């Protein structure tokens, strides 16, 4: 659902592009380390270390503007978040492939379900879900100011991806708010 006006979204995009501590992302595929085209930064309540795709990210303490937005999203979603992985795709040639956010550090000891709230800014992009066991696929066009919430069994049964598009020349930024359990990281 759209939670921000076009004007609010444009202001957030401009501010976050200029003020977040963007760094190239790294992943390990088949034992080889790659630097991706997209940029990322991870913020949180503490200086957590988050491991995914064979690499480690060190959380920075919350940027004040990001923290205020987190509090707003927590009220909308009805779920607490203690971290945010921010992703920057500078144009449509930058994407993220099929994956699930199912790391043990994202699941509480009491339940297996992961809750991720993802807020988009900038270019409208195609975001897809693909069922892990069935031939089922869902395509969404994510607009600036739009929030989607992945919860329940989403990460267990579905993979998701941001698709490439050579026609898109504008940036897309998305903020993925998560609850991170540092003691459960393996």
What are these regions (language model features)?
Residues 1-186:
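Non-heme Fe(II) oxygenase metal-center motifs and adjacent flexible, charged/small-residue loops
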């Amino acid at each position: 659902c759209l939670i921000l006006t076009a004007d609010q979204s444009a202001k957030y995009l401009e501010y976050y592009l200029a003020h977040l501590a963007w760094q190239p992302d790294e992943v390990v595929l088949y034992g080889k380390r790659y630097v991706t085209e997209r940029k990322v930064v991870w913020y949180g309540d503490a200086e957590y270390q988050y491991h995914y795709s064979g690499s480690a990210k060190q959380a920075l303490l919350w940027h004040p503007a990001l923290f205020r937005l987190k509090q707003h999203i927590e009220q909308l979603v009805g779920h607490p978040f203690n971290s945010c992985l921010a992703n920057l795709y500078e144009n449509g040639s930058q994407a993220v492939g099929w994956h699930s956010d199912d790391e043990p550090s994202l699941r509480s000891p009491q339940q297996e379900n992961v809750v991720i709230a993802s807020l988009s800014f900038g270019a409208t992009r195609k975001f897809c879900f693909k069922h892990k066991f069935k031939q089922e696929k869902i395509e969404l066009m994510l607009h600036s100011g739009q929030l989607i919430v992945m919860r329940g069994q989403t990460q267990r049964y579905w993979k998701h991806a941001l698709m490439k598009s050579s026609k898109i020349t504008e940036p897309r930024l998305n903020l993925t708010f998560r609850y991170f359990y540092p003691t459960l990281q393996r």
